[in-house]
């Protein structure tokens, strides 16, 4: 089952978020992570969704709204997607992505956009299998801003 996360899900969502951070080589920082998630849950712009197996949260995703100003339509950015190691290979990521697409469509979105690490071949395989295509039209740049 997949449903929108609420503040009541903070413990489970934080646990998965910490595991996600560790997967990408970041420190766990449990207290900071929980505060970060709680702040995001209280904001109304982004959406967290949890995948459940009974009472256990086994995956999460975080969607952020944006706009395609050329098409003058909303888009959603899949900022985070993580499935617990114990639940991988069971279709959880596919179910989360399907839910994300249905949610985005319900808002009139033009597209769902995501990014993944170059070496995350398992995720790339899933995305390609589900019809996601690599963006070659634009180059994306970023600049880190020091506090």
Question: Which positions does each model-derived feature cover?
Answer:
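Acetyl-CoA-dependent GNAT
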Residues: 4-73, 79, 97-99, 103, ...
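Hydrophobic adenine-recognition pocket in adenosine-nucleotide-binding enzymes
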Residues: 5, 81-83, 116
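Conserved G/P- and acidic residue-centered "switch" motifs that form tight phosphate/ATP-binding loops
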Residues: 55, 91-93, 108, 120
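Conserved acetyl-CoA-binding loop-helix of GNAT-fold acetyltransferases
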Residues: 83, 89-102, 125, 129
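Conserved beta-strand-loop-alpha-helix junction that forms the acyl-donor binding cleft
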Residues: 88, 110-123, 142-145
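Conserved active-site alpha-helix within GNAT-family acetyltransferase domains
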Residues: 94, 118-137, 143
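Conserved GNAT acetyl-CoA-binding A-motif
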Residues: 97, 104-115
């Amino acid at each position: 089952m997949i449903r929108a996360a609420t503040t009541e899900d903070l413990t489970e969502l934080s646990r998965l978020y910490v595991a996600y951070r560790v997967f990408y080589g970041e420190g766990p920082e449990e207290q900071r992570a929980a505060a970060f998630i709680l702040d995001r849950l209280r904001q109304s712009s982004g959406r967290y969704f949890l995948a459940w197996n009974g009472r256990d949260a086994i995956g999460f995703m975080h969607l952020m709204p944006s706009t395609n100003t050329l098409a003058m339509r909303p888009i959603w950015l899949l900022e985070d997607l993580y499935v617990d190691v114990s639940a991988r290979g069971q279709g959880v990521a596919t179910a989360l992505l399907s839910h994300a697409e249905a949610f985005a469509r319900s808002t009139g979105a033009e597209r769902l956009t995501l990014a993944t690490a170059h070496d995350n071949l398992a995720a790339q395989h899933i995305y390609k299998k589900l019809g996601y295509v690599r963006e070659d039209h634009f180059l994306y740049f970023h600049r880190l801003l020091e506090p």
